């Protein structure tokens, strides 16, 4: 079990949360999800995800530090690799890199994901980053990215030559890519047991395609909204708006969504949210989130 925060929290708060997570024994890591400036509509200000990770790293000593996720559509793999290497050095080898499409973040950018298909984009990004981590000389020219670099002896300098890369995977093609090439798979918000089973099955198919045998403890992580309070009603309220935001996100950005289907709720349950999207009121949907939806998607103590 780990802890995840978005990078719209203040850096001092992030450091306090990271220390508390480490002291509480969360062995699954302290993770940062990249926030974007559209969170201002909720009164929140985005910070740079790597700077936020650095703040968490400086406040801790042993807990794994992870990024879940940043998008290869937003940063060239060479830039991603440089940022990874810096955080990994700062953390003494505790860093885990996570990459994923991040549709919410790139919807304001002029990327055509129908032409720049996510699977090859992420494949090429991992290829380049791993070659940079290795320190070996290389020249790479892919369909979307290219890079060439002279050698550098990272190992002698005490730097890791293999930094784990996890893939954020919502759909079956990205889940198969995770099985073929990644060091771990990250699932999106509103993860449910049924969706985990679905994703792991696709991941295994991808591994089989590559002739790869995944260990039983191959990392698979999912984002689960959680709130703790002595007052159960207050805990429900704390997660209700976020649950609504995630539901809208899935309906807007993912075709043939399997996350919502995995909840076991009928498809008609999401019709009020679809109407809100059509009406332009998708930012005010907390009241549409039922107790049953929260039971399927969240962990509430109180």
Where are these regions (language model features)?
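N-terminal beta1-alpha1-beta2 module of alpha/beta enzyme domains
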Residues: 1-66, 163
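Active-site mouth loops of central-metabolism enzymes
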Residues: 1-12, 68-78, 159-170, 226-227, ...
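An alpha-helical appendage that flanks or caps ligand/catalytic pockets
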Residues: 116-156, 196-302
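Generic structural signal for well-ordered alpha-helices
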Residues: 15-19, 50-57, 81-85, 119-130, ...
